[in-house]
Amino acid sequence: MTIVHRRLALAIGDPHGIGPEIALKALQQLSATERSLIKVYGPWSALEQAAQICQMESLLQDLIHEEAGSLAQPAQWGEITPQAGLSTVQSATAAIRACENGEVDAVIACPHHETAIHRAGIAFSGYPSLLANVLGMNEDEVFLMLVGAGLRIVHVTLHESVRSALERLSPQLVVDAVDAAVQTCTLLGVPKPQVAVFGINPHASEGQLFGLEDSQITAPAVETLRKCGLAVDGPMGADMVLAQRKHDLYVAMLHDQGHIPIKLLAPNGASALSIGGRVVLSSVGHGSAMDIAGRGVADSTALLRTIALLGAQPG
């Protein structure tokens, strides 16, 4: 069955992690025609080493590749280094630019290692922040949406303390996240999603028993979204609404509200989309797995599902 119909850019992520390996393993499962629609970005040396470890040297012969990101040879599997962090950003940036210029239709990036990127002196809080910076957007305009196990969960806030998230949350930020997610649902074949907005506090504050945040932030956002003609329920307790599984799109206020259910139900099969910009970028719902890098045992399931998700036939 053909799963790739769109042109995709595939950045290999941290070259010292499992990115090069899972990229090759996923590509091996595609037909030659499908592989011809995917351009790989990253250090060729890391791909060569991964191919040797996985005995996939023949796959490199028809790989469409663009060198992006400098890397000392050989790759230092499992090592967290500034050079690998810089390479991660360089390869992802090149892929984003290719999409922005119309060379490809969407971008997929293998896992990064945040510490390596910070050691390179680069401000970074995940692929959404990188996408925003490359496109010249405010970071508040790009959101993370996890897709897996039949769930689609957009995050209004992401990699920050709970205190910082509460200070930043506003009705408009919630509205912007939902608008971006609804547009993305259309791209994914769900044009009129039923939306559920999680409360900030337990039980969506139980009236105002557990705080004023939901009456001041999420409830006004829901009212605005309904006036725009969207089918939105909430705010509701995340535990209750997820148990019901009646909605197409869920809106998490905080990182763990969205990550825990996805990682519980789809530990190796989730996609992580950065949405809200003119370029759609997706990574996978797991990390760079430095502890198993270079051993040939990494699972490419999540990456293959992400390729299928973004490579699907439009409409």
Swiss-Prot record:
Q: Reaction catalysed by this chain? A: (3S,4R)-3,4-dihydroxycyclohexa-1,5-diene-1,4-dicarboxylate + NAD(+) = 3,4-dihydroxybenzoate + CO2 + NADH
Give the highest taxon in the source lineage: Bacteria
Which SUPFAM superfamilies would you find in this protein's record? Isocitrate/Isopropylmalate dehydrogenase-like
Signal peptide (from-to): none
Question: What biological process terms from GO does the record include?
Answer: phthalate metabolic process
Specify whether Hydrolase is a keyword of the entry. Answer: no
Tell me which residues bind a divalent metal cation.
159, 203, 255
Q: Which UniProt keywords apply?
A: Metal-binding, NAD, Oxidoreductase
Family affiliation: Belongs to the PdxA family.
Function, as annotated, reads: Involved in the degradation of terephthalate (TPA) via the protocatechuate (PCA) 4,5-cleavage pathway. Catalyzes the dehydrogenation of 1,2-dihydroxy-3,5-cyclohexadiene-1,4-dicarboxylate (DCD) to yield protocatechuate (PCA).
What's the protein here called? 1,2-dihydroxy-3,5-cyclohexadiene-1,4-dicarboxylate dehydrogenase
- Report which gene this protein is encoded by: tphB
